[in-house]
Each structure stands twice: as structure tokens, then as C-alpha cells.
Amino acid sequence: MEKTFLMVKPDGVQRAFIGEIVARFEKKGFQLVGAKLMQVTPEIAGQHYAEHTEKPFFGELVDFITSGPVFAMVWQGEGVVDTARNMMGKTRPHEAAPGTIRGDFGVTVAKNIIHGSDSLESAEREIGIFFKEEELVDYSKLMNEWIY
């Protein structure tokens, strides 16, 4: 089953959106297989944002993601990577459609509530940065037979 990595960023945690976001993905029919509230270290932030190390905004990314706790999650389901991206909305909240997480709650590009993997490859890499294999729980949900 396809997996993706999602993270409620420090602004989303401080604004009490964890429950709302989890509920949206559960109601969609996706399965939460790993989750933790954590403080991102500069080392983890550097790994997570490795593709941006040479960009002028890299320092701001690291400063923000380490500024407070995040809620890291692994979700699984059919088409979860692409569907999660659609549910999050465009990166710039003012361009995100109403009904999406960023469209409903995002304020600025920097403080846009949530991060989600943009591909299966990114999901695998990001899951490996934030979770150990034994932290992910593989279980059957009775409702899956009604969804898939």
C-alpha cells in the first residue's frame, strides 16, 4: 500500500490544527500508521530540506521548522501521495482553493500549516528521516473492505 509523509508545522501545532488535519485524512479513508509530536533538530531539518541547502531561504526554513514542535505522520492508502497534496492545497495559501487545508487555514508561504511529500520517492526518504521502521504500525482496518 502506498505511504506518504505529512507534518503539521509549528504554526499548525500552535494554532491547534492537529485534530482537524488528522480528521480530514481519516474521513477521506486513509490509514494513519505512524505519528509523533516532536521537536525537529537542526540536523533533522538539514536532512529534510537537503535540496534547498544552497538557496537563500534555507536558513529561514530551518529556523522555522525548529521553532516549535511539529506533528509528524505517516499515512497509507491508494493514491495517498497525490490525494494528500490535493487536500493540502497549493503552497501559497492565497492560491489554495477553499476547502483545502492551506486554503482554509494558511496565512503565508512560510506559515502554511502543513508539509506533505511530493512523490513516492520523497515520501520514502522523508519517512526514513522522521521514523524508524519499528515506529510504523501495520494493521488492518475493518473499513478498508468498504473503501478498497
Curated annotation (Swiss-Prot):
SUPFAM superfamilies xrefs: Nucleoside diphosphate kinase, NDK
The encoding gene: ndk
Active site per UniProt: H115 (pros-phosphohistidine intermediate)
NADP as UniProt keyword: no
Phosphoserine: residues bearing it: S122
Record note on quaternary structure: Homotetramer.
Residues the record lists as Phosphothreonine modifications: T91
Protein name: Nucleoside diphosphate kinase
GO molecular function, one term: metal ion binding
InterPro entries given in the database record: NDK-like_dom, NDK-like_dom_sf, Nucleoside_diP_kinase, Nucleoside_diP_kinase_AS
CDD domains referenced in this protein's UniProt entry, alphabetically: NDPk_I (cd04413)
